[in-house]
A protein has these predicted regions:
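A short, compositionally biased
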Residues: 12-19, 63-69, 196-202
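Beta1-alpha1 glycine-rich phosphate/pyrophosphate-binding loop at the start
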Residues: 114, 121-174, 178
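Fe-S ferredoxin-like electron-transfer domains
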Residues: 2-12, 52, 59, 68-131, ...
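Short, contiguous acidic and Ser/Thr-rich linear segments
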Residues: 26-34
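Terminal leader/tail segments of proteins
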Residues: 2-17, 36-38, 42, 47-50
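Short helix/loop capping segments that flank catalytic or ligand/cofactor-binding pockets
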Residues: 39, 148, 230-232
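FAD-binding core/adjacent interface of flavoenzyme oxidoreductases
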Residues: 54, 76-114, 171-247
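A basic, amphipathic helix-loop patch mediating RNA/tRNA/ribosome contacts
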Residues: 36-74
Length: 247
């Protein structure tokens, strides 16, 4: 049986035409709003990397935590579950021993400041931001949309009928809407990789597609959520074996 990682739920319909990208020289069909992991798995490509002569790896957690779905995207190492599929991408399996390539010069970090920095735009992070009345707030999240795993929102390539969606989606959409209507600034697709004290303030270094940013805040809330803790067993890392978060 071929596992499918494509959305098929009441109230969610595809919008826009499909497209294709290349994986190991083959054409892989994809749709707007889905990740490389979803498109590759649905096309039957379960093994995405190798960890030894006879040890292959594939999509496992589906939420960017384990790194098992790492592939080369236009020559760069990326997690397939965290990269949106796009036309004309060239994707290759991650080799066991990758050849390092020179990195492009990193631009200077832009500087941002706020009263409160929230790391994580899931339920807890959004609730904290919504409750911070009167403060300047910045929220960062490595995903392209707020909501986290619990309030995960459909991708940008879908037409939605809110009345037909479940209560969990509507609750999350309402919370996200409240934060969007507030003065809080949401920086999606941004990862925090360092935090240090500077006197009475905290300096957090972040990276994103639009370059690095250094955020200075008086207070910091870490609301990075939870990840699954699978139970090891024989065959648990075989390509096609996934946690519930991915499946």
């Amino acid at each position: 049986l071929r596992p499918l990682m494509r959305v098929s739920l009441p109230g969610i319909a595809r919008s826009g035409p499909g497209f294709a990208f290349r994986f190991s020289g083959e054409t892989v069909p994809a749709w707007p709003g889905e990740t490389l992991a979803a498109a590759l798995t649905s096309a039957g490509h379960l093994a995405l990397s190798t960890n030894g002569p006879d040890e292959r790896r594939g999509v496992y957690c589906g939420m960017g935590a384990c790194g098992e779905c790492t592939v080369l995207v236009n020559g760069r190492s990326q997690r397939a579950c965290m990269v949106a599929a796009a036309p004309d991408l060239v994707v290759e399996p991650m080799p066991r021993r990758a050849v390092p390539t020179p990195a492009a010069p990193t631009p200077a970090a832009r500087h941002l400041a706020c009263d409160l920095l929230v790391v994580g735009a899931g339920p807890a992070g959004l609730a904290a931001a919504a409750a911070a009345a009167g403060l300047s707030v910045i929220i960062i999240d490595e995903r392209s949309k707020a909501g986290g795993q619990y309030f995960k929102q459909p991708g940008t390539g879908f037409a939605l009928t809110p009345a037909a969606l479940d209560g969990q989606y509507r609750e999350g959409a309402a919370l996200i809407g409240n934060v969007a209507a507030s003065p809080a600034q949401l920086l999606a697709g941004r990862t925090a990789w360092s935090a240090q004290r500077d006197g009475e303030r905290i300096v957090v270094e972040t990276s994103g597609a639009d370059g690095p940013a250094r955020i200075t805040a008086a207070r910091l809330i870490i609301a990075t959520g939870a990840t699954e803790k699978p139970w090891p067993m024989p065959g648990w890392m075989l390509p096609g074996v996934m946690t519930t978060g991915a499946a």
